[in-house]
Amino acid sequence: PNAANQTFNLTNGEVFLWRDLWPALADVLDVDTGPDEPLDLAAYFSERIDTWQSLAATHGLIETNLMRLLGESHHYANLCFAHGAVASPPPALVSTIKIKQAGFTDTHNTEASFCHWLSVLRDQRFIP
């Protein structure tokens, strides 16, 4: 009842930096981390369409068309990672007081959650 017709800031509440997550994500995916430098994901993935088709065939993945799999996410990631910006943006911080007062208090570890969902995507053959 406290949540009816309300708008809430929804976040796990944990402040994190992507560069701190890369080693754990790489471990789940059985790959090495790359250099810590900016990367234009839209250009990167656009240049690897044939590579994805080959990976998808080799690993029996569900989606062989990389652009269908990604949708617009690689463009959104460029925005979130501030690709091309002169300086890194500050972490996005929002107040979660209102949502907690309405009774939504559950939280999840960010690294563990990302690792879990990458494992699910792998198990369901969306990624190799």
What are these regions (language model features)?
Residues 90:
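Glycine/small-residue-rich pyrophosphate-binding loop that anchors the diphosphate of NDP-sugar donors
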Residues 100-128:
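C-terminal/domain-terminus segments
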